[in-house]
A protein has these predicted regions:
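Ser/Thr-rich, Pro/Gly/Ala-heavy low-complexity intrinsically disordered linkers and tails
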Residues: 1, 12, 16-32
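N-terminal export and membrane-targeting signals
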Residues: 3-8
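Alpha-helical interaction segments
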Residues: 9-10, 231
């Protein structure tokens, strides 16, 4: 499997141009349009870090639209991503996988993401994601046990859906991510990316934004910029890497081909080693993510442009 570094380089610079066994998981419907999926328990020894995946049927017998989701993660969870996938069912067994590779390469489509223990999200009225009938869901769960005791990793997702056939008019949404792999933080030092600018395609609209750093992160900021260099309209300022905000943008950001997003990540390296970009929770990342519409596919941004994953 491709590493997350090479995958993100591919996502942000090229591709977008064009597992140990475990147990525990389920998916089910609640009878009110909600569909649920879970993973775990995943036993974690002290200082253990692992990423596991599992594929299960979502349980939707007809085409539905996703209006929002709730995620609840147990202590020790670093992140959880739910994807639409064409892969075959593995549940109740898990398998080892690399974090974020389903975002950057392949054909899996991320539909829900949590980087905090409790996330609730609803799309604005008139925006939703398409989920075909009889879909399979892949759950990717990244855990790190920083305690002196054993932990049991667990994650649950509740998808709020409605039958597509009877849904009111909506615009189809998709996932957008921007970031950099150019991270090298000297020992016992502070470091900043400085402002980085990306301009999503004209005619698209961003409706939610969140940020993602690892344990040395001290601040992640995002601005809605009329042009490169404009820092007059800050839309998020996360100072707790472990619990970044999910911000619904009101008003939404309407991209016109000139305006865009500016983002900046800051860190303080309290270790005696240089810390660089990487997939481990002991490495670092600088990613902003969110949802946009109308869907042109998964968008990844580096430099000024954003391109669709092929």
């Amino acid at each position: 499997m491709a590493s997350i570094r090479s995958g993100l380089v591919t996502l942000f610079a090229a591709v977008l141009v064009s597992c140990s066994s475990g147990s525990g998981s389920s998916s089910s419907g609640s009878g009110n349009g909600d569909l649920q999926a879970s993973i775990g328990p995943i036993p974690l020894k002290p200082s253990e870090e692992t990423t596991v995946c599992m594929v299960m049927p979502l349980g939707n017998t007809e085409d539905v639209v996703l209006d929002g989701f709730d995620m609840k993660l147990a202590p020790g969870s670093h992140h959880l991503i739910a994807y639409l996938t064409d892969a075959g069912v593995t549940a109740p067994n898990t398998f080892a996988c690399s974090p974020f590779t389903g975002v950057v390469i392949g054909t899996d489509v991320p539909i829900a993401f949590a980087n905090a223990e409790d996330i609730s999200f609803s799309f604005p009225k008139g925006v939703a994601m398409d989920i075909p009938a009889n879909s399979n869901i892949k759950i990717e769960a990244h855990y790190i046990n920083a305690t002196a005791n054993e932990l049991q990793g667990h994650g649950q997702v509740t998808f709020h859906t409605a039958p597509k056939a009877s849904a009111p008019p909506y615009q189809a949404a998709n996932f957008l991510a921007a970031g950099t792999v150019d991270i090298s933080i000297p020992p016992n030092s502070s470091y900043s990316t400085g402002p980085l600018f990306a301009s999503p395609p004209a005619g698209t609209h961003m409706v939610i934004v969140t940020t993602h750093e690892h344990r040395l992160g001290t601040r992640a900021q995002v601005w809605a910029s009329a042009k490169e260099g404009d820092l007059s309209h800050e839309i998020t300022d996360d100072r707790n890497w472990a619990s970044p905000a999910w911000r619904t943008l009101s008003p939404q950001i309407d991209f016109d081909g000139t305006n865009g997003l500016t983002y900046q990540c800051d860190w303080t390296n309290t270790t005696d080693q240089t810390v660089t970009f990487g997939e481990s929770a002991l490495d670092e990342m600088c990613i902003i993510a969110g949802y946009y519409y109308p869907s042109q596919g998964i968008l990844g941004c580096i430099g000024h442009g954003c391109k669709t994953r092929q």
